[in-house]
Amino acid sequence: MPIGNLGHNPNVNNSIPPAPPLPSQTDGAGGRGQLINSTGPLGSRALFTPVRNSMADSGDNRASDVPGLPVNPMRLAASEITLNDGFEVLHDHGPLDTLNRQIGSSVFRVETQEDGKHIAVGQRNGVETSVVLSDQEYARLQSIDPEGKDKFVFTGGRGGAGHAMVTVASDITEARQRILELLEPKGTGESKGAGESKGVGELRESNSGAENTTETQTSTSTSSLRSDPKLWLALGTVATGLIGLAATGIVQALALTPEPDSPTTTDPDAAASATETATRDQLTKEAFQNPDNQKVNIDELGNAIPSGVLKDDVVANIEEQAKAAGEEAKQQAIENNAQAQKKYDEQQAKRQEELKVSSGAGYGLSGALILGGGIGVAVTAALHRKNQPVEQTTTTTTTTTTTSARTVENKPANNTPAQGNVDTPGSEDTMESRRSSMASTSSTFFDTSSIGTVQNPYADVKTSLHDSQVPTSNSNTSVQNMGNTDSVVYSTIQHPPRDTTDNGARLLGNPSAGIQSTYARLALSGGLRHDMGGLTGGSNSAVNTSNNPPAPGSHRFV
């Protein structure tokens, strides 16, 4: 029995039964003691269906007898299925795999170019890498990024078989990335070459030492007064007070009790007189309508003719009624005047009360807000000027040490070369060379202005009594004048007695012609004896210092 229409035979109506998933597509489900079969829970067709509906799958639905089942099972690899808002990146040398190999577990972003291509851009160690994403990978990234941040992160080998997982970059990840960028070392300062120092006076030398080049990077976080929130709070308070003033004025003009008109008063006497006259005229008119109220005249024929004059009693009655009406009108006028004044007083009192309340609440509060806001602005400005931000300075110091040889140029003051030759030791000892150079310099420099203040440099110079060249017969040997006209600097060389522990010789005398004469006489006389560091070479001088260097200590001349 055929298991299904594998060959697309139209004569076979059998459908394809659900097949078990491939082992690589179950994420190790088969190793958990659950048998994979076509009817079990792990053999459900849902394992073959991606969690999301991708565009790549929808285009291939017609290629299968079962709708929704893709043709190539590799389409359902682990990287296709999202789990916990992430998916695996297979080692398939695809764009995401290539980007992961370049930047590792770092953040990358997705951008869309003008031509419609989607690229993923990541950075590591200052090198930016970008790859062009396929439509399927871009769809995967969109499926796990519903908010559209377009920022993702590789979370290392957390997937199956060491695959990296791709998840949406959280705020913590972005903060970590920014911290790492801030912690990257900026450039160091430029160091200058050493050996550029110049000599001082007649002694020119290239100093041996260190040069410090300091590069100072200053970042000052300054903020203007307008960026201070307290200033805007104070200005807002002032604005609120101004608005309160305007609102109070509008309310008082529209909503309060209007200003009452002046009360209309009527003169009671005028009202009484007018009423009395009107009543008299009205009653008189009515009385003339009745002929009985008129007096009658009898003519010659004896006929009664109305005379047009009211009877006296009728006139008296009319006058009485007119006075009564006038009195009543007077009283009514008095009462009306009193009511009008009362109404005016009540309305005026009510308005004043409303004005008092509204002014106290509106103008008072608004004025307080304006005053407080003004004080706040002044205080904020003062504090801003007082509390200026401190500059944050980062100093990078680069030290370059260069050792150079010392070059000494001797220039005697009298332009006269020193008598004799100076024996300097070899170059194997730097300190010895320096001492010899300084001795040579000292031998050619002298100051005639300080002869009287020069201390005796030979007071403690010692010599050995075992030297065969030292005469022992005479303890006091005179220094002969060698034909020089200069005065003798030291008259004698005194040797100590043999029973004393001090075996050194002592020069006696006072300096009178300067150190230069002493050097000249010592040079002419053959110099000092052995163990005293002879200065010049001669037949009677000590052994050359290049062959027999002087001993350190008090036996050194210099």
From Swiss-Prot:
<feature type="compositionally biased region" description="Polar residues">
    <location>
        <begin position="538"/>
        <end position="548"/>
    </location>
</feature>
<keyword id="KW-0812">Transmembrane</keyword>
<keyword id="KW-1133">Transmembrane helix</keyword>
<feature type="transmembrane region" description="Helical">
    <location>
        <begin position="363"/>
        <end position="383"/>
    </location>
</feature>
<keyword id="KW-0597">Phosphoprotein</keyword>
<keyword id="KW-0843">Virulence</keyword>
<dbReference type="InterPro" id="IPR037003">
    <property type="entry name" value="Tir_central_sf"/>
</dbReference>
<feature type="compositionally biased region" description="Polar residues">
    <location>
        <begin position="404"/>
        <end position="424"/>
    </location>
</feature>
<dbReference type="Pfam" id="PF07490">
    <property type="entry name" value="Tir_receptor_N"/>
</dbReference>
<feature type="region of interest" description="Disordered">
    <location>
        <begin position="182"/>
        <end position="226"/>
    </location>
</feature>
<feature type="region of interest" description="Disordered">
    <location>
        <begin position="1"/>
        <end position="44"/>
    </location>
</feature>
<comment type="function">
    <text>Multifunctional protein that is required for efficient pedestal formation in host epithelial cells during infection. The extracellular region acts as a receptor for bacterial intimin, allowing the bacterium to attach tightly to the host-cell surface. Simultaneously, the intracellular region initiates a signaling cascade in the host cell, which leads to actin polymerization and formation of actin pedestals at the sites of bacterial adhesion. In strain EDL933, acts via the effector protein EspF(U), in a phosphotyrosine- and NCK-independent manner.</text>
</comment>
<feature type="compositionally biased region" description="Low complexity">
    <location>
        <begin position="436"/>
        <end position="450"/>
    </location>
</feature>
<feature type="topological domain" description="Extracellular">
    <location>
        <begin position="252"/>
        <end position="362"/>
    </location>
</feature>
<dbReference type="GO" id="GO:0005576">
    <property type="term" value="C:extracellular region"/>
</dbReference>
<dbReference type="GO" id="GO:0016020">
    <property type="term" value="C:membrane"/>
</dbReference>
<feature type="region of interest" description="Disordered">
    <location>
        <begin position="388"/>
        <end position="451"/>
    </location>
</feature>
<feature type="topological domain" description="Cytoplasmic">
    <location>
        <begin position="384"/>
        <end position="558"/>
    </location>
</feature>
<keyword id="KW-0472">Membrane</keyword>
<dbReference type="Pfam" id="PF03549">
    <property type="entry name" value="Tir_receptor_M"/>
</dbReference>
<feature type="short sequence motif" description="Essential for actin pedestal formation">
    <location>
        <begin position="456"/>
        <end position="458"/>
    </location>
</feature>
<comment type="similarity">
    <text>Belongs to the Tir receptor family.</text>
</comment>
<feature type="compositionally biased region" description="Basic and acidic residues">
    <location>
        <begin position="182"/>
        <end position="205"/>
    </location>
</feature>
<dbReference type="Pfam" id="PF07489">
    <property type="entry name" value="Tir_receptor_C"/>
</dbReference>
<dbReference type="InterPro" id="IPR003536">
    <property type="entry name" value="Transloc_intimin_rcpt_cen_dom"/>
</dbReference>
<dbReference type="InterPro" id="IPR022638">
    <property type="entry name" value="Transloc_intimin_rcpt"/>
</dbReference>
<keyword id="KW-0964">Secreted</keyword>
<protein>
    <recommendedName>
        <fullName>Translocated intimin receptor Tir</fullName>
    </recommendedName>
</protein>
<keyword id="KW-1032">Host cell membrane</keyword>
<dbReference type="InterPro" id="IPR022633">
    <property type="entry name" value="Transloc_intimin_rcpt_N"/>
</dbReference>
<dbReference type="GO" id="GO:0020002">
    <property type="term" value="C:host cell plasma membrane"/>
</dbReference>
<comment type="subunit">
    <text>Interacts with intimin. Interacts with host BAIAP2 and BAIAP2L1.</text>
</comment>
<feature type="transmembrane region" description="Helical">
    <location>
        <begin position="231"/>
        <end position="251"/>
    </location>
</feature>
<feature type="compositionally biased region" description="Low complexity">
    <location>
        <begin position="393"/>
        <end position="403"/>
    </location>
</feature>
<feature type="compositionally biased region" description="Low complexity">
    <location>
        <begin position="257"/>
        <end position="277"/>
    </location>
</feature>
<feature type="region of interest" description="Disordered">
    <location>
        <begin position="257"/>
        <end position="280"/>
    </location>
</feature>
<keyword id="KW-1043">Host membrane</keyword>
<keyword id="KW-0675">Receptor</keyword>
<feature type="compositionally biased region" description="Low complexity">
    <location>
        <begin position="213"/>
        <end position="224"/>
    </location>
</feature>
<feature type="region of interest" description="Disordered">
    <location>
        <begin position="533"/>
        <end position="558"/>
    </location>
</feature>
<feature type="topological domain" description="Cytoplasmic">
    <location>
        <begin position="1"/>
        <end position="230"/>
    </location>
</feature>
<dbReference type="InterPro" id="IPR022639">
    <property type="entry name" value="Transloc_intimin_rcpt_C"/>
</dbReference>
